[in-house]
């Protein structure tokens, strides 16, 4: 059933004035300031690729794409964009905007528009621009090399396995989610076979995480230098439930709140963000980082969110107020030698494990016990033996007994297993020093006590050397295996008792014959 006809919001005689308000590159949800746009020639034909597509991408394609085609309508494919959906009526009638149901659906009538559902209506200049494009014939000027060829019916074809950026086991231990190209691959957790392929819009998949109950899968990624996207999949039905466009580049470090109601992620516009997992609605945006935000995790009760980034900081944010609370790790120059890439929470405690460019996994308490003083690192609980190269992934076993970290250095990779059980209570003598003195005033004895405490009961249990850098880690729920993957596209299941590789497999289906080059 098509929307009730409504009067169009423009006359073409006044079109030029309206077009002055249109941003050529429409801003997706939560967008930062867009790149500088070209000067718009108001007499030139409207470009679908440069002017119309960005509006649809930001406002419509989350619900109208091959993986989630509400009403049978797909707006990511030009032919299907014109054709319409289940009603059988064409959505776009070239040269006739007044007879195009798409224009009717997005036009305000008595302050409301039928589309986009559950979102703010398009602005009047945006609607006017779309109508002008249709009046000019609804021409498709999409570059040939930009036409989308991949969807669930036409999944990626691999000649070799791509680099793997993220892994996660389902809470019940039955599935292993693996980041691929344009998709997430669900495998049997023992590596015995592929279960499903979740193909979406995002070319690059940066992060995958199962919900606490295992019924949903959150995916962070996007189209590099064009759009970020957060996807939420129904694991049982293998269907896309929510798709949220975010900014102008891929997004990172997705995580779930303990109750499964919120999803957090980091962005290259230096913002930490969170959305409602059911609706995709924005609930948090915090801009305290000064560089890309690469990892996120909630504290035990979900009241606070912790993030790490390329700015060498670990930041604490209160969820309800969106208020920046504290720098958890030291921000003193030299305390951390490079950006932070990874974060995990210690089970049952408000403590976080972080790793980054300096190759040293470190454990911090989330909430400080003493007032911050210049140069202090008073939240540090443990330093683990250093790895060679940069750390790209860290994890804690579910029982809290083991810690793992993965690194990359000069084309080589390594996985370290450490002891994870120890008393992390800060001694009174250190609490007093942290409270009374700045770091440069610590005595020789106090410095020795800090070193003794932060390295106590910490032991390297196993070191596994691998081909290619390792970018992703995940403990199996039973703690018996550790999945590791990275540059060479292989997934290894490593035993946690000895650090040996029990299974090595390629997670993507490889083409049997070489592809011919596209013309």
PLM features per residue range, with description:
Residues 13-27:
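Bacterial N-terminal signal peptides
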Residues 141-519:
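WD40-repeat beta-propeller superdomains and closely related acidic/aromatic-rich repeat-like regions
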Residues 1-12:
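N-terminal secretory signal peptides that target proteins for export/translocation
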Residues 12-14, 32, 212, 300:
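Generic detector of N-terminal low-structure segments
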Residues 28-171, 180-181:
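Aromatic- and Gly/Pro-enriched helix-to-coil junctions and flexible linker segments
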Residues 6-8, 26, 501:
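N-terminal leader/targeting signatures
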Residues 2-4, 23, 29-30, 49, ...:
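Residue-level detector of alpha-helical hydrophobic segments embedded in or interacting with membranes
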């Amino acid at each position: 059933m098509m929307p009730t006809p409504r009067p169009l919001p423009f006359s073409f005689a006044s079109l030029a004035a309206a077009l002055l308000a249109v941003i050529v590159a429409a801003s997706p949800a939560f967008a930062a300031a867009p790149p500088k746009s070209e000067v718009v020639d108001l007499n030139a034909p409207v470009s679908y690729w440069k002017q119309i597509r960005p509006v649809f991408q930001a406002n419509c394609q989350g619900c109208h794409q091959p993986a989630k085609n509400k009403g049978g309508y797909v707006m990511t494919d030009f032919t299907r964009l014109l054709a319409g959906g289940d009603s059988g009526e064409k959505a776009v009638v070239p040269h006739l905007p007044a007879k195009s149901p798409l224009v009717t659906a997005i036009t305000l009538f008595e302050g409301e528009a039928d589309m986009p559902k559950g979102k703010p209506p398009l602005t009047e200049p945006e609607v006017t621009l779309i109508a002008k494009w249709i009046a000019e014939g609804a021409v498709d000027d999409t570059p040939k090399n930009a036409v989308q060829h991949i969807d669930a019916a036409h999944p990626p074809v691999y000649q070799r396995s791509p680099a793997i950026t993220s892994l996660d086991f389902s809470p019940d231990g039955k599935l292993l989610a693996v980041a691929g190209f344009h998709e997430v691959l669900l495998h049997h957790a023992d590596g015995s076979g592929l279960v499903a392929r979740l193909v979406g819009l995002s070319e690059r998949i940066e992060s995958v995480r199962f919900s606490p109950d295992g019924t949903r899968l959150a995916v962070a990624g996007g189209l590099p230098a064009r759009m970020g996207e957060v996807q939420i999949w129904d694991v049982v039905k293998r269907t896309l439930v929510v798709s949220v466009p975010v900014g102008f580049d891929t997004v990172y470090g997705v995580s779930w709140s303990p109750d499964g109601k919120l999803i957090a992620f980091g962005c290259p516009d230096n913002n930490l963000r969170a959305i409602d997992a059911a609706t995709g609605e924005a609930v948090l945006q915090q801009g305290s980082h000064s560089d890309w935000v690469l990892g996120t995790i909630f504290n035990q009760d979900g009241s606070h969110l912790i993030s790490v980034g390329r700015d060498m900081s670990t930041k604490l944010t209160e969820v309800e107020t969106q208020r920046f609370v504290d720098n958890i790790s030291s921000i003193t120059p030299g305390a951390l030698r490079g950006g932070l890439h990874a974060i995990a929470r210690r089970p049952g405690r408000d403590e976080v494990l972080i790793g980054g460019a300096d190759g040293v996994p470190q454990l911090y308490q989330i909430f400080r016990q003493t007032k911050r003083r210049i140069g202090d690192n008073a939240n540090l609980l443990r330093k683990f033996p250093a790895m060679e190269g940069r750390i790209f992934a860290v994890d804690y076993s579910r029982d809290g007994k083991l810690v793992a970290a993965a690194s990359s250095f000069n084309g080589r990779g390594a996985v370290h297993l450490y002891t994870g059980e120890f008393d992390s209570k800060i001694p009174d003598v250190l609490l007093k020093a942290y409270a009374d003195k700045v770091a440069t005033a610590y005595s020789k004895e106090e410095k020795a006590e800090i070193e003794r405490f932060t390295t106590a009961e910490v032991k390297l249990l196993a070191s596994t050397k691998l081909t290619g850098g390792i970018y992703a880690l995940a403990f199996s729920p039973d703690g018996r295996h550790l999945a590791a993957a990275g540059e060479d596209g292989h997934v290894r299941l490593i035993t946690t008792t000895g650090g040996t590789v029990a299974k090595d497999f390629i997670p993507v289906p490889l083409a049997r014959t070489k592809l011919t080059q596209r013309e």
